[in-house]
Design a protein with these regions (language model features):
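Phosphate/adenylate-binding glycine loop and adjacent helical scaffold
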Residues: 1-152, 156, 160-163
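Hydrophobic/aromatic beta-strand elements that line small-molecule binding cavities or substrate pockets
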Residues: 169
Length: 173
């Protein structure tokens, strides 16, 4: 979209979404791109769309999480080994941590009967680094892992309708 802000910002708290945007090329054919919908109101007075390269998320020590024994079910291996630490941006909002979600609310699914697969990958990091995105199981159920950079079968987030979701974003320590 032409209304994307490109001035570099660092966001360290508040709500934002990785958002799929839909436009059209010169022939009217739909085109899609990713942007950050910044609702933090820390670098602007209102919600704004930002280009991905212009946004840095600051993850501070208060996001450090050690996997407890109570989450020893293998479904939670996305957090690393029991007793291991990682940085987690949680599924539920914590006002002291950046709270990223995922949104396809700007996509018209009428011409997409099979839905949309959004590929996700870890671009860079130290040796052995990983990133993941999962939603906690409800009522004691197993978590749903949407993305795990260590598992090629978990490299896309699939949606079949307009979606706004939050999950746990995990980054190795």
């Amino acid at each position: 979209p032409s209304d994307l802000l490109t001035v570099p910002v660092t966001l360290s708290r508040g709500h934002l979404d990785l958002r799929v945007t839909q436009g059209a090329d010169g022939n009217g054919t739909p085109s899609y791109a990713m942007a950050v919908k910044d609702d933090t109101r820390t670098a602007a007075r209102a919600s704004v769309l930002r280009s991905l390269p212009s946004v840095t998320l600051a993850v501070h020590p208060n996001a450090y999480y050690v996997r407890p024994q109570s989450l020893s079910d293998p479904g939670y291996d996305v957090l690393g080994a029991v007793g291991a630490g990682s940085y987690v941006l949680p599924q539920t909002q914590n006002s002291d941590i950046v709270w990223p979600g995922f949104s396809t609310e700007g996509v018209d699914y009428a011409g997409l009967p099979d839905g949309v697969d959004i590929g996700v990958r870890l671009l860079d990091g130290p040796a052995g680094a990983y990133a993941a995105f999962f939603q906690s199981g409800s009522l004691g159920g197993k978590p749903t892992v949407h993305f795990d950079s260590r598992d090629p079968s978990k490299s896309a987030i699939h949606t079949t309708s307009s979606t706004h979701m939050h999950g746990n974003w995990v980054f190795s320590a």
